[in-house]
Amino acid sequence: MQELTADVLVVGGGTGGTAAAIQAARRGAKTILVSEFSWLGGMLTSAGVAAPDGNELIALQTGIWGAFLQELTRRQPEGLNHGWVSFFTYDPCVGAQIFADWVAALPNLHWIAGQAPEAVSVQENRVTEVTFRDYTVRAKLTIDATELGDLLALGEVPYRWGWELQEEFDEPSAPLQPNPLTQQYPVQAPTWVVVMQDYGEGETAPEILAPPRDDPDRFAGAWDDYGDDRFLNYGRLPGNRFMINWPVKGNDYGEGVDRLLSIEQRQEFLCEARWHTQSFARLIQMQLGRRYGLATDIFPVGGEASLGGGAYALHPYYRESRRIQGLTTLREQDILPLSKGCVAPLPITVSAQGCTQAENVCDAIAVGNYPNDHHYPSGDIALKPKSMRWGGRWTGTPFTIPYRSLVPIHTDSLLACEKNLSVSHMANGATRLQPLVLGIGQAAGMAAALCVEQDCQPRELNVRLLQEALLSDTIAPTAVIPLLNLPASDPDWHYWQRYYLDRPDAYPADGYCPKRTLGISTSSPQSLSSIPATTSALLDVYGTFQKKADQDYTLMVTTSIAFQGQVLKLVTLDHHVNQQLLVTTPHQQVKVLGTINTSGGWLLAEAIERI
């Protein structure tokens, strides 16, 4: 047993843990990252979700998430605009290599792969060390970045698992009492992703064999409402490959999901989930033809990935975890938009100074925007809406994560940074998404490094110091306040981020900051910095603009060799283009600079000009 010491120990190499370790090390902390698998990145890579959701608007592409998109664009010449479920689809291998390269570039970051936590030592309510099969690591600060919050159970840190009734948090969508759904599916269903491949017309892919438990009737009608092509193109990847993460009678698996809490029973659940996906892939091949088979060269094979590897992700895509009982709990109403607004209220805490002075402090440290999305094999549930039309399409309304939700209520020297933060079951449907978890991890890593610098506990850390460190990071500055009209490249970005941190009561309900009148203007519509990280080549597309309804646009293509005469949905992720679309006259002839996504039937506009 090798004994190691560090300033910061990050347990788990998933989405949040990878970001946390990178950020802590970049800040200068001696950091050890211990991962169960040979790939870093979790949901974004080893779990196969190479079509991330949320934070797609340019103004929300900040921090490590924004840097990841930029690096994907640089390394994937085919661009990122392939499927229709996301604006960013990529080869999982490319994503994993990006994270590995970033880690390798940090000499004060020691990465150990192939180890899972087995014991946690807690002395006087303080986590002191974590034991793995071959190592014991003692650190000043420990970050639980495991997929299922395993350190919480091992260290007997108070946590939640499953549904809360409406009486607990007064959440509008929470159940009034237990019901068959809450009892059968205590948490959201995981999905074991598989990547399939089109071998080409006239080609025959190897047969996908039946798993030990095969019941194709479970998938009856899975894509009837979509058609074969649209079903496959949902998660289309480069190279005629398809991410299979299908929510409608597909490969979500939640039977006996409570078994994940038991190390002894977890393997049984994992086997069933893996077989469930294999059965679905076999059905796809049988119904759509033998030109479709497994993409067997995606994930590493062997060792820790005994159930996964090849075409199958190394582990399931976990949507929910054990969740710490933190200094505050993020609830459904905390992520819903303000009345007559399109952003959630900022999280406010009262900071007392002595007996007479107190002030309201905004402790936002990460930004998300995904709609509240819950997955249960039995189907959708009724949820309070948190979506809006923007840029010609539906998107989620922005919200923030409070720092206090990363800090356990009683336990010191510990932070959460995955889906294990202090959040209700209902709100978890929006906080679990990959870009936001990167942001949570980045904040946790920075907080841990600052605690080492300040020689303080996470609960004692000055949150304004943390926010300033995140905003001013020299490599990947990240937003803590969602501003829909201001990308991080804008010269006013830092000013308005700090302005609303200092004056949270002034935060606008529409998420739009005013233009300053100090001689500094926001970026122009033609600024190259406003081009999102989605494509490798842009096209000039001419056509007739049509407005079907509010924020619902099309373009009848008039001059394009490949697309002439076609009607494409016209969408954008750019604030300036969004504003132009709002005022463009129907039947106007326009030139659009953008990329065409044949899977989604849309033209993603980076700039638009009337002609």
Residue positions per predicted region:
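Beta1/beta-strand and adjacent pyrophosphate-binding region of the FAD-binding site
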Residues: 2-14
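N-terminal Rossmann-fold NAD(P) dinucleotide-binding loop
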Residues: 17
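Conserved N-terminal/central alpha/beta ligand/cofactor-binding core
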Residues: 23, 29-30, 34-119, 160, ...
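OB-fold (S1/OB) nucleic-acid-binding surfaces
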Residues: 549-573
